[in-house]
């Protein structure tokens, strides 16, 4: 993985952020098929990944695509970072990750009460948000759990 950091904190390494290669390792990949830092290049972002209020403006559609009602953040995710890249099937991958997590929770709670289901949602949510056990595409899982737990 590469390292991306806030230009204002160039020598403050605590502000560095790990980023993916964004489909840039393969030879012959078209620029429009790159994502994340590879697609962003030197463009500045409006969204601040260190600011929870900024990140909370990111939303997910049922098909797994990512967007924001904030026009600048939507431009960041859709254009600058190309996070709905069809060449990499990013929306479908997000949707698949969410379906797998829903299935895991349903299997674990099968035959149990609604309270057990809610406790499993709370446990999973705490694992992701408080314990920071973050996994690829976990944003869509967090968003779904928040909708179920009515967290905004």
Roles of regions detected by a PLM:
Residues 29-75, 83-91:
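Long, low-complexity, intrinsically disordered segments enriched in glycines and aromatic residues
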Residues 18, 54, 101:
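Functionally constrained cores in energy, signaling, and assembly domains
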């Amino acid at each position: 993985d590469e390292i991306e950091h806030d230009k204002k904190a160039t020598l403050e390494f605590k502000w560095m952020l790990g980023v993916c290669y964004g489909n840039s390792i393969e030879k012959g990949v078209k620029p429009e098929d790159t994502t994340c830092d590879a697609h962003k290049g030197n463009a500045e972002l409006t969204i601040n990944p260190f600011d929870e209020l900024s990140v909370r403006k990111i939303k997910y559609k049922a098909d797994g695509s990512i967007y924001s009602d904030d026009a600048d953040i939507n431009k960041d995710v859709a254009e600058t970072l190309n996070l709905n890249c069809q060449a990499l099937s990013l929306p479908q991958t997000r949707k698949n990750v969410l379906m797998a997590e829903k299935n895991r929770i349903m299997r674990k709670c099968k035959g149990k009460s609604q309270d057990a289901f809610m406790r499993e949602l709370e446990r999973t949510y705490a694992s992701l948000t408080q314990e920071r056990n973050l996994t690829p595409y976990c944003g869509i899982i967090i968003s779904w759990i928040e909708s179920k737990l009515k967290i905004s």
